[in-house]
Amino acid sequence: MYHTDTPPRRIHCYDFDAASGAISNQTVLLRTERGCFPDGSTVDAKGYIWSAQWAASRVVRYSPEGEIDFILPLPVSHPTCAAFGRPDLNMLFITTAYQGMMPEAREAEPEAGNLFIFQTDITGIADPLFRPIDLSRSRIG
């Protein structure tokens, strides 16, 4: 299991027990270079991580060992997340942001905030489904 910690520019790796939900053995898989903030990510069928990198105008595919496999440049500075979709899971969807950009930066990046879609030769894995819990019956909140 992976976890992105954006401000310190790290992606962590954990052992995950699917039966119990327990995580253990946290390690830092990689740290991005200065100015490249890993944000939302996904994993493909070969176990490679696709990391949208805030302020870096790119999505990076990392090997399971944390080595850069390739870089997908984008025409916007703030990609936020990558996910595979379509029935064959061979389309890469990348969300981006424009909120908080100064007007001149927004003008320089007219595609900021758009969804980018790329057909790939790589197969993704389906993101796990989420089932919300009924918080009205909990002691939280």
Predicted segments, located by residue:
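Short loop/turn segments immediately following beta-strands, especially the blade-tip
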Residues: Y14-A22, Q119-I125
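Blade-level signature of beta-propeller repeat domains, shared across WD40, Kelch, NHL, RCC1
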Residues: A83-G141
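Loop/turn-rich, solvent-exposed surfaces of beta-rich toroidal or solenoidal domains
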Residues: R9-Y14, A22-Q26, L30-E67
